[in-house]
Amino acid sequence: MTEPDEEAVALAHTLFQAARDGDTALLRSYLNAGAPATMTNAAGDSLLMLAAYHGHAEAVQLILKHGGEANSANDRGQTPLAGAAFKGYTDVARVLLDAGADPDAGSPSARAAAQMFARTQILDLLGQ
């Protein structure tokens, strides 16, 4: 069995943390250098999912610009839009919707999450 490349693992951890923190400068640097915007962690969470779930609209926009997939689901079937709806991040939801995110994709869908947690501003964006 091949051992994982320690430098690659460290870089991945750095990028995932940058997405969680909304560190757009660091993300931009690595994405411009060719880091894949679609990379996922062990739970299937993409950079986009982590940025969306933690409420970083600018980072979400940056990742989308570099090829992040608005409707990609993690291993639990959750999409970035569902994460934003669950947490009530209207600005993030707007960015994702503008990029073509499907409010009915995933399980639970963004629409279902917004209804479940009474996120009325998100529901308004989704057209209920």
Task: State what each model feature region is.
Residues 1-33, 42-45, 128:
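Intrinsically disordered, low-complexity regulatory segments in ankyrin-centric signaling systems
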Residues 11, 44, 77, 107-110:
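Start-of-repeat signature of ankyrin repeats
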Residues 26, 58-59, 91-92, 121-122:
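Conserved ankyrin/ankyrin-like repeat signature
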Residues 28-36, 61-69, 94-102, 127-128:
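Ankyrin repeat domain, specifically the short helix-to-loop turn at the C-terminus of the second helix
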Residues 38-40, 70-73, 103-106:
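Ankyrin repeat boundary signal
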Residues 93, 97, 102-128:
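Leucine-rich solenoid repeat scaffolds
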